[in-house]
């Protein structure tokens, strides 16, 4: 079980809602993944409708919504979007995203920290998307973020855990859950993140853009479970030389 702020999750696989061919496929994939938390950009939600066409399948499945501020270019934009999301969706949970560069979508660390500090004061449960920067993640924790979401690799790149060395430090020193977000392109990437000790992973593109999203969602579900189980079981340490798994010569003396 994973507890973040006031919610407890059985699944450690969080999902995104973008890039699916249609809303029905999105809902089916999320259900197959077992995910209990799905993030959605506020700009995709019709806040004037009480039963938004995109949101409803997720709500009907009992999945928690995590609105995000994708598209915000600075702290001011993100704070405005956050309050709009809370009013429209009735949740104080927020995935904080600030990436002013439209090409690489790198999160702005200065604006993210500034926005996070204010949003926590405003009563939000803040989950910030950020660089795999151990110092920044500690600062975000110190201002009251409920979890941190460092990137594995650039958004949508499917490059996997490119920031492994830094993620290991973040995981080691964190006192809040660490959710590896962005760049996870295969179930094996998700398993690796979990084996490292990450508390959860968030996956979108790898599921939505696959040829069979529902089957891929199941694959990610199993990978996350396997990775977590391996971490708890205790992985055998790495060594620089060969170590025989059985005696090489003792049987000759028998």
UniProtKB/Swiss-Prot annotation:
1-deoxy-D-xylulose 5-phosphate binds at residues 156, 182-183, 204-205. The keyword Transferase applies. It is found in: Cytoplasm. Pfam families: ThiG. Pathway: Cofactor biosynthesis; thiamine diphosphate biosynthesis. One of its GO terms (molecular function) is thiazole synthase activity. InterPro entries: Aldolase_TIM, Thiazole_synthase_ThiG, ThiG. Catalyzes the rearrangement of 1-deoxy-D-xylulose 5-phosphate (DXP) to produce the thiazole phosphate moiety of thiamine. Sulfur is provided by the thiocarboxylate moiety of the carrier protein ThiS. In vitro, sulfur can be provided by H(2)S. This is Thiazole synthase.
């Amino acid at each position: 079980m994973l507890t973040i702020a006031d919610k407890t999750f059985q699944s450690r696989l969080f999902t995104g809602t973008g890039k699916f061919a249609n809303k029905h496929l999105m809902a089916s994939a999320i259900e197959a993944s077992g995910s209990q938390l799905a993030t959605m950009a506020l700009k995709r939600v019709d806040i004037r409708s009480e039963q938004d066409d995109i949101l409803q399948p997720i709500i009907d499945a009992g999945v928690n919504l995590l609105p995000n501020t994708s598209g915000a270019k600075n702290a001011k934009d993100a704070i405005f979007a956050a309050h709009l999301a809370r009013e429209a969706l009735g949740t104080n949970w927020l995935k904080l995203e600030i990436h002013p560069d439209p090409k690489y979508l790198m999160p702005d660390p200065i604006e993210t920290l500034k926005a996070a500090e204010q949003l926590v004061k405003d009563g939000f449960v803040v989950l910030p998307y950020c660089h795999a920067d151990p110092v920044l993640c500690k600062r975000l924790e110190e201002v009251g973020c409920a979890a941190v979401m460092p990137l594995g690799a650039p958004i949508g790149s499917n490059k996997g855990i490119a920031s492994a060395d830094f993620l290991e430090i973040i995981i080691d020193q964190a006192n809040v859950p660490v959710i590896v977000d962005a760049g996870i392109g295969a179930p094996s990437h998700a398993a690796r993140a979990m084996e490292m000790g990450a508390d959860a992973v968030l996956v979108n593109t790898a599921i939505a853009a696959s040829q069979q999203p529902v089957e891929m969602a199941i694959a990610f579900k199993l990978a996350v479970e396997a990775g977590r189980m391996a971490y708890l079981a205790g992985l055998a340490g790495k060594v620089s030389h060969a170590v025989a798994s059985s005696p090489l010569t003792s049987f000759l003396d028998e």
